[in-house]
């Protein structure tokens, strides 16, 4: 039995706020980042400043200006022990699903564009001291990104329905990572985190999932030797390494055939992981059926989301630049340089 949320009494966001936030943060994050870079801070400091100033401050300011209920808007409710336990069970399965989707996405991007785009700054951060890496790549995004997407944006979108809020916030979250090959994986994480936060009413459960995903990937990257990438760059073939060639030669097959077999295996593991996650979601629905709060929908309120179109346009321009650069078109690099992404 879902409880009804009284939006007027609690003063919670509406779709207009979600769209406004996405546009403001997208423009702020994409364009204003280049001004922080002019101070010549380290990559670590740049990341902290961009996450806090661009992802946390705007939604908090909007909530304060419009006098929204901070605790309810951002779902600052302590998670129940059973919920935390379930998050810890879901997390590794989600990481496997995300890794499989990411590998398949990498192959897809290489197949479509012939090359892939590697974000070197993130790779460098993951290869840092393990504690610093976890703080910067796992803890910081888990807190800042969740407050924006599962806080202000998702809460506002709930006025058009819980299902739409989960779907749209997940899509917006995936797009915001500006990465073709990770788009599917990040969107999957966005859907799952959005659903978990909605069902449990606690943003901290979303943070646990987010931290677990980034944290495990960071640990993997931290202990991988010889794979450092300095700066963002285009790589023609990320699989053109001795290890792949040796494995292919061992089984008397080509590297392309090896990658095809790996893609099929990863697809199977992805399907199994998604099935397991679906089963765990059923368990989550069961333990939250008496506590989940049903949002109060308002007919026509979705029109307010149109203010988010400039933000989507901004992100679309970035993806266009990335695509053109992968196609070896000089216009792509010019677009990304103009946007402050290079």
Give the label of every model feature segment:
Residues 24-65, 267-271, 334-342:
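Alpha-helical transmembrane segments in multi-pass membrane proteins
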Residues 39-44, 123-127, 238-267:
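Membrane-interface segments at the starts/ends of alpha-helical transmembrane spans
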């Amino acid at each position: 039995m879902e409880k009804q949320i009284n939006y007027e009494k609690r003063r919670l966001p509406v779709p207009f706020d979600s769209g406004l936030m996405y546009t403001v943060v997208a423009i702020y994050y994409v364009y204003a980042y280049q001004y922080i870079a002019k101070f010549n801070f380290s990559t670590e400091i740049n990341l902290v400043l961009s996450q806090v100033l661009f992802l946390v401050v705007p939604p908090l300011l909007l909530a304060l200006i419009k006098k929204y209920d901070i605790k309810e808007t951002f779902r600052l409710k302590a998670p129940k022990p059973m919920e935390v336990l379930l998050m810890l069970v879901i997390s590794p399965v989600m990481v496997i699903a995300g890794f499989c989707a990411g590998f398949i996405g990498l192959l897809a991007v290489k197949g479509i564009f012939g090359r892939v785009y590697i974000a070197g700054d993130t790779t460098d951060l993951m290869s840092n001291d393990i504690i610093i890496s976890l703080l910067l790549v796992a803890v910081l995004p888990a807190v800042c990104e969740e407050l924006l997407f599962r806080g202000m944006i998702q809460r506002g979108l709930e006025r058009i329905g819980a299902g739409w809020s989960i779907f749209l916030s997940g899509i917006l979250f995936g797009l915001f990572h500006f990465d073709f090959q990770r788009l599917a994986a990040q969107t999957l994480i966005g859907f799952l985190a959005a659903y978990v936060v909605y069902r449990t009413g606690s943003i901290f459960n979303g943070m646990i999932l987010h931290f677990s995903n980034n944290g495990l990937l960071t640990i993997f990257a931290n202990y991988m030797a010889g794979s450092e990438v300095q700066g963002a760059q285009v790589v023609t073939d990320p699989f053109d390494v001795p290890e792949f060639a040796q494995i292919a030669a061992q089984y008397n097959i080509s590297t392309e055939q090896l990658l095809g077999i790996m893609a099929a295996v990863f697809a199977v593991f992805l399907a199994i992981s998604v099935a397991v996650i679906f089963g765990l979601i059923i368990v989550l629905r069961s333990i939250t059926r008496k506590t989940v709060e049903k949002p109060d929908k308002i007919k026509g309120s979705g029109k307010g989301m149109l203010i988010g179109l400039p933000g989507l346009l901004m992100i679309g321009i970035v993806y266009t630049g990335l695509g053109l650069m992968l196609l070896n078109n000089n216009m792509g690099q010019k677009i990304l340089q103009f946007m402050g992404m290079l």
